[in-house]
Every structure is written in C-alpha cells, then in structure tokens.
Amino acid sequence: HCANFHIKIFQKLKIDLLDNNKVKYEHHAFPLDLAALNAEKVLGCVENDEKKLKLLNELYKNQDSWARGSDINSINQKIFKITNNYGLNNDKNKRCLNDQDLEDEILNERINASKKYSIEATPTIFINEKKYSGQHNYEDFKKAILKYL
C-alpha cells in the first residue's frame, strides 16, 4: 500500500509541488513487520535528506524483491544490496540493524502515531492536519494540497 502510494502518487506530487518548494513532505516510519522495520532502520542511518528520499523511493520501487524471503537474514541481505548504492556498506548496515536506540525511536514513533492520529491503515496521509486513509489517486491529493496554496 505505501509502495503503491509512493510510486504512483508521491512521485508525481514531488515533481509538481515538492521540487519547486511549494509544499513540505515528511516521511514517518510505520513498519508493520520485521522486514519493514529493518528497512526503516537502515533508512534512518542515511544522513542526507535527499539521499534518504532517493533510497526510500528505491526501497518502495523494489519492495517485492526484498520484503519476502525464507528468513530475516535473507531479507536483510536483499535490503543491503539496495542500500549499498546509497553510501551504506554492509558494516554500517549491520550497525544500523543493531542500533537499539534507533529501533526504539522507530517503534515509539509508530505507537505514538497510532494513538495520537488514530492511524489504522497505511498509507495514511495528512495534509494540513486533515487525514486521508485508504485508496486515493494523484488528482485527489493534488486538489487537496492546492486548496492550501
């Protein structure tokens, strides 16, 4: 669901509204399984925001190739193949996966978002505090955003 939003809707919104600084975008982690948590952990180790957004795009674009595997180690290796192109070598990837503070931060963000914003499905998008859950399309979001510009 998040990958679908990111690839089919967000990329167009990025070109139309983010790249020319008309709107601000914030990605918040909401992992639903261990594979997603580990992807968020290595994403959290990318310090450059532009690189982080590019890596997020790459992870979503290739989600079908890494999100499933025979065990979590094989999934992690698939994630590493993607993140290696973004300045994270295997040692840094492993440090990120073992970073308990980072894991706590991601999981606490998920728990707090669930409570504060009553998030029940992903993706959940907020535009000026108005919540959008479920299926939407590019035109719906663009129209909702343009109301505030």
Explain the meaning of each model-derived region.
Residues H1, W66-A67, C96-D99:
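Short, contiguous strand/loop micro-motifs
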Residues A3-N84:
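Structural alpha/beta surface segment adjacent to cysteine/selenocysteine redox centers
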Residues I7-F10, K81-L149:
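C-terminal cap of thioredoxin/glutaredoxin-like
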